[in-house]
C-alpha cells in the first residue's frame, strides 16, 4: 500500500489510520508521485487565505474516491484542525470503500480515557461526548465506555496528593528475547549481557540513592513502586533482596499504596524469590504466561510450558500476596480468536486478582 503525503507532516496519524482498515498491508510512505500500488491513499494540504485546504484521494483496486474541505482556524490551532480534518476525510472514504466503520473513529495511538478526562475538564461531560462522537467519529457505545473508564480513573487520581509520585525501576534483562518484543532488553543467554547484570544492579542501587535524596529535598511522597523490565525474575533471590533493600534505604515506603514486582516469565519463579518479595512487603506481583497455547509459546521463543505457568501461579498464590496479576497478549503470531479466548478462559479459571491484556 502507498500513502502519499503532500504539504504536511501528518504521516504518523495517516499511516495509523490506514492500518485500521488494512492491518496486513505493508505501507510505504511517499512524498512524491513515484511508485504504483493497487492500494493508494493520497493526502494533500494547501495553504489558503484565512486557513488551508485539505484533500484526500483513495484509489483501491481501481475504485477512486475523493473528498476535500477548507479549514479555517486561528493560526495556533490551524495545524491540529487540518490534521483532524484529513483524518475525518480518510475515515469517510475508507469506510465507504471497505464497508467497515471503526468503532473508535479516528482515534489511534492514544488512551481514550485520558483524552476524555482532558476534554471533560475543558468542555464539560456533554461537550466531551459530542467531540468524541462528532469530531473524532467514535461510536456512541465506545464514547460511553471511555467516559465510564475516565470517571473511574478520576476517582483514583483524585485520591493522590499533589506532592505524590510513582517510581518505576527497570530491569532490562530477560531469559531469552521473545520474537514480538520491542522493549529495550538483553537476553542473559548472551555472555556479555550476563556479565553486565551485576554491574547494572550496582549502578541501579546508586541511582535509587540519588533519586531518594532528590525526593526528600523536594518533599515528595512516594505512592507506588513498580519493578518492570525486561524480566525482573531473571535476578537471583540474593540479588533481588539486595535491590529491594536499596529501595528501602533510599525511600520512605510508609505511604505506599501499591508495591509491584513484575516477575515476568513463569520459569523464573522460585520459592526463594517469592519469599524475598514477601519479606520486603511487596504486595502485588505479575506472572506473565502471555498465552496458554504451547505451540505459540514455542513459536515466540518462550522457553517455558503451559504447565510451568500454572504451577508458578499456584506457587505464588501460596505466599499470600495481595494481588497476583497475569498478562496475556492478543494477536500473537499464528493465534486465532479461538486460541486467545481459550487462554482467557484458562486464566479466568485460575482466578487471579487481575488479568492484563496487551495487544
PLM ranges: what are they?
Residues 69-91:
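Extended acidic/polar, glycine-enriched regions
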Amino acid at each position: 500500500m502507498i500513502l502519499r503525503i503532500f504539504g504536511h507532516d501528518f504521516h504518523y496519524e495517516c499511516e495509523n489510520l490506514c492500518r485500521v482498515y488494512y492491518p496486513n498491508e505493508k505501507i510505504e510512505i511517499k512524498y512524491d508521485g513515484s511508485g504504483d500500488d493497487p492500494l493508494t491513499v493520497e493526502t494533500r494540504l494547501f495553504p489558503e487565505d484565512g486557513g488551508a485546504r485539505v484533500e484526500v484521494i483513495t484509489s483501491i483496486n481501481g475504485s477512486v474516491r475523493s473528498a476535500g474541505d477548507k479549514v479555517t482556524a486561528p493560526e495556533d490551532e490551524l495545524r491540529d484542525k487540518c490534521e483532524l480534518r484529513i483524518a475525518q476525510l480518510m475515515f469517510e472514504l475508507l469506510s465507504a470503500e471497505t464497508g467497515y466503520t471503526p468503532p473508535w473513529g479516528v482515534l489511534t495511538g492514544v488512551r481514550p480515557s485520558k483524552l476524555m478526562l482532558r476534554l471533560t475538564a475543558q468542555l464539560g461531560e456533554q461537550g466531551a461526548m459530542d467531540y468524541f462522537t462528532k469530531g473524532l467519529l467514535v461510536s456512541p457505545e465506545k464514547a460511553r465506555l471511555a467516559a465510564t473508564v475516565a470517571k473511574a480513573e478520576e476517582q483514583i487520581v483524585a485520591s493522590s496528593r499533589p506532592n505524590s509520585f510513582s517510581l518505576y525501576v527497570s530491569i532490562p534483562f530477560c531469559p531469552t528475547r521473545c520474537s514480538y518484543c520491542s522493549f529495550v532488553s538483553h537476553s542473559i543467554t548472551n555472555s556479555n549481557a550476563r556479565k553486565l547484570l551485576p554491574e547494572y544492579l550496582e549502578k541501579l542501587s546508586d541511582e535509587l540513592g540519588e533519586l531518594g535524596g532528590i525526593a526528600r529535598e523536594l518533599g515528595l511522597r512516594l505512592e507506588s513502586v513498580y519493578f518492570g523490565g525486561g524480566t525482573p525474575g531473571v535476578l537471583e533471590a540474593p540479588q533481588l533482596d539486595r535491590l529491594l533493600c536499596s529501595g528501602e534505604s533510599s525511600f520512605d515506603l510508609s505511604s505506599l499504596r501499591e508495591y509491584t514486582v513484575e516477575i515476568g516469565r513463569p520459569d523464573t519463579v522460585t520459592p526463594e524469590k517469592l519469599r524475598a518479595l514477601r519479606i520486603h512487603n511487596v504486595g502485588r506481583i505479575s506472572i506473565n504466561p502471555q498465552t496458554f497455547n504451547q505451540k505459540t509459546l514455542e513459536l515466540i521463543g518462550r522457553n517455558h510450558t503451559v504447565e510451568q505457568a500454572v504451577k508458578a501461579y499456584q506457587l505464588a498464590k501460596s505466599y499470600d500476596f495481595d494481588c497476583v496479576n497475569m498478562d496475556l497478549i492478543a494477536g500473537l503470531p499464528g493465534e486465532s480468536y479461538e486460541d486467545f479466548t481459550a487462554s482467557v478462559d484458562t486464566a479466568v479459571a485460575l482466578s487471579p486478582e487481575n488479568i492484563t491484556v496487551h495487544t
